[in-house]
């Protein structure tokens, strides 16, 4: 079962040379799932960095998810796809039993449909403004409703910090996906730990 704190290591915030160091701090802080998102990197570079991150993640029993590229994700723990990426059925074919997560934005119907097709988890847009996600804001009702009908983990993404993590869990989210509140923090390990504590104390 996937844990509740999902951290995205994004190349927009972290230089390639710092990835391992930052990853280690995130893992020490207690992240449950780690995703490598490097939208502007070519595949060879993603694969090379992922191999190094995967060793660290494995030491902490944390899955490493690759944003997009199921052909790379299958070498590690799995992939996460959005609507501009590869179709779900094709990704599932490549990944087989590996983790496959999908961005559902503010669409619960898509999530329900994917649940029947064997998606591992889904992510919904949080109601908060976010520096990394351009989106329609979704309300808390989406999460309250999702809690009633989804059997899979579902994460809130977008503008999540410590206080908002608490709020999202109270409004029904299974977990939260965090980018800038951790990657831009002066103390990455401490920020990760505080958000983790906020989540698990709000369940």
Indicate where each model-derived feature is located.
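Short, loop-centered acidic/histidine patches that primarily coordinate divalent metals
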Residues: 125, 159-160
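Conserved N-terminal beta1-alpha1 strand-loop-helix module at the mouth
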Residues: 1-88, 93-120, 152, 160-166, ...
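Flexible, gly/pro- and Lys/Arg-enriched active-site loops
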Residues: 83-89, 126-149
């Amino acid at each position: 079962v996937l844990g509740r704190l999902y951290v995205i290591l994004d190349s927009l915030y972290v230089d390639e040379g710092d990835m391992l160091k930052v990853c280690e701090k995130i893992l020490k802080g207690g992240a449950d799932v780690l995703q490598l998102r490097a939208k502007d990197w070519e595949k060879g570079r993603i694969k090379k960095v992922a191999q190094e991150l995967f060793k660290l993640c494995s030491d902490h029993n944390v899955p490493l998810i690759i944003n997009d590229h199921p052909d790379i994700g299958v070498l590690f723990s799995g992939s996460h796809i959005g609507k501009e990426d590869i179709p779900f059925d094709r990704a599932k074919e490549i990944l087989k039993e590996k983790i496959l997560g999908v961005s559902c934005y503010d669409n619960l119907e898509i999530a329900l449909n994917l649940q029947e097709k064997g998606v591992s988890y889904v992510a919904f847009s949080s109601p908060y403004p976010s520096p990394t996600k351009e989106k329609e804001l979704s309300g808390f009702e989406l999460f309250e409703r999702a809690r009633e009908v989804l059997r899979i983990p579902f994460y809130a993404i977008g503008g999540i910090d410590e206080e908002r993590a608490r709020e999202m869990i109270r409004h029904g989210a299974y977990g939260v996906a965090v980018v800038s509140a951790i990657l831009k923090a002066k103390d990455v390990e401490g920020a990760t730990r505080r958000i983790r504590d906020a989540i698990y104390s709000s369940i």
